[in-house]
Amino acid sequence: HWLARAPGEQRGAARIAARAWAAAFVALATACAIYPVVATRARWRDRFDAATGFTLDGQAYMKTARHVELGQTFALGPDLEAMRWLEQHIEGTPVIAEAHTPEYRWGARISTNTGLPTILGWSWHQTQQRASLPADLVTRRAADVDAIYRDVSVDRVLGILDRYRVDYVYVGALERIFYPSAGLEKFAGNPDRWQPVYRNAGVTIYRVVR
């Protein structure tokens, strides 16, 4: 009697198992479908100001966003205003000097958002893409950017700017956080070498006089 029932019982058990797996699959698929809807919005609220709303303007967040570097908080609005000025008033693709920072920071933000070339962008990207070149190429450039903003010698800094054919020097909140005031004051103190061409509440852009 048991042997006669065994195949039917096995089929019943198989159907139960199949239904259980199907239910599990439906639950998993439902969770996967819901996650992007719920998680994306939560992530967006965590990282961006919700007041910006939905937009195709990739720079809109800067109107209200505040950023933290080395424990200091600053608004991104002045950088956005300066970027817009550069886009509207600068012709061609002149090289602009700006702060160089470790990865995942606000460094190279002017070059990134305007398309203007800078001395050095994201260090690791440059290292990867230039593997066949001398290993210290990127570190030398990083040191030169550091010197532009730290060195108080006008002649030495002008030499570095000439080497990279830099036409504009950018001084904003990020530069004031990463570099000493003595190194930044030389730009304002030598208008015959660095002519201020733009200024707002947090940014000054200097044109290199040649």
Range-by-range predicted roles:
Residues 2-41, 47:
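Signature aromatic-anchored transmembrane alpha helix within multi-pass, membrane-resident enzymes
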